[in-house]
Amino acid sequence: MTVLKMTDLDLQGKRVLIREDLNVPVKDGVVASDARILAALPTIKLALEKGAAVMVCSHLGRPTEGEFSAENSLKPVADYLSKALGRDVPLVADYLDGVAVQAGELVLFENVRFNKGEKKNADELAQKYAALCDVFVMDAFGTAHRAEGSTHGVAKFAKVAAAGPLLAAELDALGKALKAPAKPMAAIVAGSKVSTKLDVLNSLSSVCDQLIVGGGIANTFLAAAGHPVGKSLYEPDLVDTAKAIAAKVSVPLPVDVVVAKEFAETAEATVKAIADVAADDMILDIGPQTAANFAELLKSSKTILWNGPVGVFEFDQFGNGTKVLAKAIADSAAFSIAGGGDTLAAIDKYGVSKEISYISTGGGAFLEFVEGKVLPAVAILEERAKA
């Protein structure tokens, strides 16, 4: 995957527009989770160190396009950046017709979704973005699967279009895990439904050696193998699909599970052998023997891709399976990559973020890359690099 990289460019005195993913949760006018801002900071600092006049843009939330809304304003992000960088970071609302920024200065543009034509990727808007800068830097992997004005359109028209360090690192890590993985490779794919992860499961079945499934997805595979799943969440109409996937790749199934009679924080957890699951049982986690078996598989893997907790880890009594696998990945010498919202929450809960080789910041984009889909914002950078 050949793209121009910001790190290779001379930015001295250049006007640089950086598209970041600063779509963070905001509560009472204050940033509630700063993970995405922290991920973007090194890119912003590097552009400033290289002597650029730096303009940063992002979306936040889902405002009605073309209309300002205070709740979707990036003001809390500008305030956060000012504190984090120890300098004033002005929030600029009217920037489409030009903005004065000097070398070494930094401004944050107001929410790009307040601009008409952003989501439709209108050429007229994209050309206005492009006219603001000498160099456009796409650094928002989390929105790379969307062809929008500030992610794709601007890269068509900017004098120079490059990948930022964060985007480049994502592409390198995903390429390492999927294009030429060190073998054996294990993938953990968990979630409530096979239907939502079908493309991911199919794509990984042709590249990995062990496909570990969890959550409602595992229940469908268990049912496909003729095991009882009680009143657990599963998809009867996808049993044949599960069988077809299991015929292509090794899908180790749980030998024991943690069940309850209800889905609740106060539900009583009981460990049962898979054959003993009763008609009124709900499977809410893998059992301790299964967790140990899966951890052993991970120990011998050279590449591990993790997407989704294997149980209802938000309730502690159903969190052991995810905890054991998280620790196994952390202790492994394998190249490990993890992504997807719930996966990140599990990584935080069990404190293993420093031991995982790469944690992807993109939820939907991560999944689409794993599915083998083309990410429009990356494809345009590749096109521009060829030209």
Curated annotation (Swiss-Prot):
EC number(s) reported in the record: 2.7.2.3
Record field: catalytic activity: (2R)-3-phosphoglycerate + ATP = (2R)-3-phospho-glyceroyl phosphate + ADP
Key word ATP-binding present: yes
Family membership noted in the UniProt record: Belongs to the phosphoglycerate kinase family.
Keyword Cytoplasm: yes
InterPro entries linked to this entry: Phosphoglycerate_kinase, Phosphoglycerate_kinase_CS, Phosphoglycerate_kinase_N, Phosphoglycerate_kinase_sf
Keywords per UniProt: ATP-binding, Cytoplasm, Glycolysis, Kinase, Nucleotide-binding, Transferase
Disulphides: none
A Pfam family of this chain: PGK
Encoding gene per record: pgk
Domain of life: Bacteria
Chain residues that bind ATP: K197, E314, G340, G341, D342, T343
One Gene Ontology MF term: ATP binding
Pathway: Carbohydrate degradation; glycolysis; pyruvate from D-glyceraldehyde 3-phosphate: step 2/5
Major localization class: cytoplasm
Organism: Pseudomonas putida (strain ATCC 700007 / DSM 6899 / JCM 31910 / BCRC 17059 / LMG 24140 / F1)
GO biological process: gluconeogenesis; glycolytic process
Record's subcellular location: Cytoplasm
Protein name: Phosphoglycerate kinase
Top-level EC class as recorded in UniProt: transferase
Assembly: Monomer.
Lineage of producing organism: Bacteria, Pseudomonadati, Pseudomonadota, Gammaproteobacteria, Pseudomonadales
Record HAMAP family: Phosphoglyc_kinase
GO CC terms of this entry: cytosol
Binding site for substrate: D21, L22, N23, R36, H59, L60, G61, R62, R113, R146
